[in-house]
Structures are given as structure tokens and as C-alpha cells.
């Protein structure tokens, strides 16, 4: 009897080991640059982007990643917007050797008193791996996409996709695509099972019909490779993630776009049960959340879903890797990477070291491995997602729910004589009590300075202009920002005028 019990315990332990859950995180870090002093973007020239700025960015990325797995970090991270190394070495970087070489220094020392030309020559992802290691986020293999593009491309590439993973890497391939960062394919082995990872950063301009044909080309690049894999194994385990510069419901949200990359070409869709049929092989995990909770970025007062995770049918069967149903989420942490109004705390260059995180929230999902080896059996789904079409869900940010009195800056809270016009104050909500300024623009005189007043709601803009004459009192809550170098307050909702 004891022997049988021992055998049972051994088998149970083996199954438990196989079923260890892991997380895949997709994270656009908003332009993580190295410190070699060579950059294509104006904002990242040495006069504006210092070693202290780089340290802040590295530290803050690590702080977000450390929110997962009890501080250990996810086992798979798909990064976007890491700078291409414009001063590369003659040989590819050996990230393990770099970490070993600088094991006796901290990232603060490397970018501070111990900085030298060799450190300046390190690519951004190597600096990130070091910042991770200092925080106990260790054991990662680092894979960077090649800086390649199609012959038809007309734009140079400033950024690349990078994958961090703790799983053994079996195969790596970079896929050049039209006027966008190369799509990075990484095949890993998870408890003996193959898992394909695809890290994407498609052409920007989600709402622009003029750029959608480029995203269609990006989608075709990815779809062609997926078809190769799925022809060989229709139940292959594939996780597709990154910044697609497309909404999960691109075709529904922008009906004037006759052909969309994400929906029409790639085949991303929201019927969770449909992946069991031959006609549909991909499911977009945004459909795991209620429509009101779908958002990872903001633009003109509306939520966007540019960051996405998409899974293949194989992640619903009982062979190899399996998706944990209902585990998809948005990585927004109050007091860390989230503003008081619930939007992403963007990166800011203000001050000697900068501040903030990214203009995108990361997205994540959990997975496990299953020992059955059965592709004909599918994960039972309770309340399976089913996209039934119809009008697109509301995307306007509900600013009326914000406790303005609690979070707003006031004139009394500022030091005497201080200006609001700093990078650190951008994005903050301010209680404005001033007077309407003279001129053709609607503007307010506040704390001795003049600010434009704007709203993305055209009707509200017209009402504000009609109701407020030059010299009259003007009281409202506004989000501080800049547009074309002019400082302004954005009134996000009619309830903010009071």
C-alpha cells in the first residue's frame, strides 16, 4: 500500500511540475535608448537624454516587471521600442558575458561614476538585462530582432523588438516587413513542448486609412509564417504579441478601412469557440475583458488597444502549452505606472533624470503545460467570449468618475512663484481659477501665465467659447499639456467645468 501511495505521489508531483504556470507579458517601453550618444530621434540627442534619464527608464521598467511572480518577473517578455544599436560591435553581443563582466557593479554605478566607453557601447537591451539582474529579475535569455527591412521600405528603423525568456531557446528568426520593425520569431521549449513567440511592432497610425495598407503588409508577413507553421501542425502552440498599432476591432472601429491588417489579413477575432474549427485559428485575448475595460493606451480622450496578445487554437487543446482561461489582463498599477485619472503615466524628460514609464500599459496572460498530449480534446470554457458584431463599444474615457478634488493640483499647493510649465506636471490635473484671456483662441490667464483651453469634444469647445468672454472668471479642472510648443489645459469632460 505504501508503495502505491509513493507511486501516486511521484506521478502527482510530475504532473504538477509539468503544469507550472507562467506569464507572457507584452510591453512597449516608449523608446528605451542606450547611452552611446548616437540617436535618430531629436528628443534622444545627448543634450536632452542623459545617462540619468536612461537610468530612470531602466529602473522604472524593472519596477513594473517586478510586479509579477512575487518580484521574480514573467518567464516571457515581449518588448517593443528598444533602440536599434547605431554603434554596434563587430560581433553580436553576448548578454551572459556582459552580465558576468559587470556583476561587481550596479547599474547606477555603470551609468554614474564607473561609466566608460565600453559601457557606452552596450546596446539598450544589455543595460536592461543588467537593471533586471540588480533587482533579482534573473535567468533571462535575451533575443533582439535584426535591423532588417524589405527592399520596398522607404523609412529607416530606429527601434527593434526584443524578447526576454527563461525558457530554452530552440530557434530564432527575424522577418523583415514593409516600413516597420522586423517581426521577431522565437521558438522556446516549455517542459519539453515547443512554443512559438512572435513579437510585433507594426506601422504607426491606427486611425489613419493612409497607413493601413502598410499594416496590411505587416500582417501578410506574419500570416505567411503562421501558415507555414500551421500547415505542418494545425495545433501548434503560438503566442503573438506586441504593439500592432491597430485596435483589436480595427475593422469595426474604422469602417472606412475596407481591408485591415489585424482582422482581415491576420485573422484576429473574438469568438473563443471558433478556434476549434478549421476556419479560425487565432483568438484575440482582448475579448476576455468586458468592453468597458479594454484599453492600454489613450489618444484624444479615447482608449486604444494597440498592445495585444493573440493565441492559436493549440493553446486550447490538451497538448503542450495551454492558455489559462480568463487570465488576460492589463498591467496598470496605481501609484506606479498609472496616473490618478487611470491613464498611463507617460515618460517625461523633465528634470535632470526624467520621470514616468510609458504611454502604453503592458498586457499579460497566464499559461500552463498539460501532459495529456491530446489535440482532439479542448479546454472546457465557461462563459466563452463570442463577438457578435454590431456597433463598436464605447471607447471614450469616462473622466466624470474621477475624484477631481482629491487628485488635482491647486494654486495653493504650489510653492510661491513656481511655474506649472514643467515636464513633471504634464498630464496632471489642475484646479484652474483664472480669467479668460484676450485673443482669438480660448485661453485662460492663471498664475501670471496664459494657457490655451481645449477639449476633444467639439460641442463642449463651442459651448465654452460662447459662454466665456475676455476678462470674465473662468473656473475648471484641466489636464496640463503642450501642443505644438503651446501650453494648454485640456478639459476632458463637461463635468470638469465648475
Q: Could you tell me what each predicted segment is?
A:
Residues 211-234:
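A long, amphipathic alpha-helix that forms part
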Residues 44-54, 110-119, 149-152, 174, ...:
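Second-shell loop/turn segments in exported
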Residues 8-18:
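Hydrophobic h-region of N-terminal signal peptides that target proteins for export
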Residues 23-26, 75-81, 141-144, 161-165, ...:
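Structural recognition of the beta-strand scaffold that forms the well-ordered cores
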Residues 17-158, 350-351, 368-406, 493-495:
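N-terminal, active-site-proximal structural segment of metallo-dependent hydrolase catalytic domains
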Residues 19-24, 33, 167-171, 180-204:
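Beta-strand-turn-beta hairpins that frame and shape the catalytic cleft
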Residues 174, 178, 228-236, 246-416, ...:
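Metal-dependent phosphoester-hydrolase catalytic domains
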Residues 272, 388-498:
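OB-fold single-stranded nucleic acid-binding module
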Amino acid at each position: 500500500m505504501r508503495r502505491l501511495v509513493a507511486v501516486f505521489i511521484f506521478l502527482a508531483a510530475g504532473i504538477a511540475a509539468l503544469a507550472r504556470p507562467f506569464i507572457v507579458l507584452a510591453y512597449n517601453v516608449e523608446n528605451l535608448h542606450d547611452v552611446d550618444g548616437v540617436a535618430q530621434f531629436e528628443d534622444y540627442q545627448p543634450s536632452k537624454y542623459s545617462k540619468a534619464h536612461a537610468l530612470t527608464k531602466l529602473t522604472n521598467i524593472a519596477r513594473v516587471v517586478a510586479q509579477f511572480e512575487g518580484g521574480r518577473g514573467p518567464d516571457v517578455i515581449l518588448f517593443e521600442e528598444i533602440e536599434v544599436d547605431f554603434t554596434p560591435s563587430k560581433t553580436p553581443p553576448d548578454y551572459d558575458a556582459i552580465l558576468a563582466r559587470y556583476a561587481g557593479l550596479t547599474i547606477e554605478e555603470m551609468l554614474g561614476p564607473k561609466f566608460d566607453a565600453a559601457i557606452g557601447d552596450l546596446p539598450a537591451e544589455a543595460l536592461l538585462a543588467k537593471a533586471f539582474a540588480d533587482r533579482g529579475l534573473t535567468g533571462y535569455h535575451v533575443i533582439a530582432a535584426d535591423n532588417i527591412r524589405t527592399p520596398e521600405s522607404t523609412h529607416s528603423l530606429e527601434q527593434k523588438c526584443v524578447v526576454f525568456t527563461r525558457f530554452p531557446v530552440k530557434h530564432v528568426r527575424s522577418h523583415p516587413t514593409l516600413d516597420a520593425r522586423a517581426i521577431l520569431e522565437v521558438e522556446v521549449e516549455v517542459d519539453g513542448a515547443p512554443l512559438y513567440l512572435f513579437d510585433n511592432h507594426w506601422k504607426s497610425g491606427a486611425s489613419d486609412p493612409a497607413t493601413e495598407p502598410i499594416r496590411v503588409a505587416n500582417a501578410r508577413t506574419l500570416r505567411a509564417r503562421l501558415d507555414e507553421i500551421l500547415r505542418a501542425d494545425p495545433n501548434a502552440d503560438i503566442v503573438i504579441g506586441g504593439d500592432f498599432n491597430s485596435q483589436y476591432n480595427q475593422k469595426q472601429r474604422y469602417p472606412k478601412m475596407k481591408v485591415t491588417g489585424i482582422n482581415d489579413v491576420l485573422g484576429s477575432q473574438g469568438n473563443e469557440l471558433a478556434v476549434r474549427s478549421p476556419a479560425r485559428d487565432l483568438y484575440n485575448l482582448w475579448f476576455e475583458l468586458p468592453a468597458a475595460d479594454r484599453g492600454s493606451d489613450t489618444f484624444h480622450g479615447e482608449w486604444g488597444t494597440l498592445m495585444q496578445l493573440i493565441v492559436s487554437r493549440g493553446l486550447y487543446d490538451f497538448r503542450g502549452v495551454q492558455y489559462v482561461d480568463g487570465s488576460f489582463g492589463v498591467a496598470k498599477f496605481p501609484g506606479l505606472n498609472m496616473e490618478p485619472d487611470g491613464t498611463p503615466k507617460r515618460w517625461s524628460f523633465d528634470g535632470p533624470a526624467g520621470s514616468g514609464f510609458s504611454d502604453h500599459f503592458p498586457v499579460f496572460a497566464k499559461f500552463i503545460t498539460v501532459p495529456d498530449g491530446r489535440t482532439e480534446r479542448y479546454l472546457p470554457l465557461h462563459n466563452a467570449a463570442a463577438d457578435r458584431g454590431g456597433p463598436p463599444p464605447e471607447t471614450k474615457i469616462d473622466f466624470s468618475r474621477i475624484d477631481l478634488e482629491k487628485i488635482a493640483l491647486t494654486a495653493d499647493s504650489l510653492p510661491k512663484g513656481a511655474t506649472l510649465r514643467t515636464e513633471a506636471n504634464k498630464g496632471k490635473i489642475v484646479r484652474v481659477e483664472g480669467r479668460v484671456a484676450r485673443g482669438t483662441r480660448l485661453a485662460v490667464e492663471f498664475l501670471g501665465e496664459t494657457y490655451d483651453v481645449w477639449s476633444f469634444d467639439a460641442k463642449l469647445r463651442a459651448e465654452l467659447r460662447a459662454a466665456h468672454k475676455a476678462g470674465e472668471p473662468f473656473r475648471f479642472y484641466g489636464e496640463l499639456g503642450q501642443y505644438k510648443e503651446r501650453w494648454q489645459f485640456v478639459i476632458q469632460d463637461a463635468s470638469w467645468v465648475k
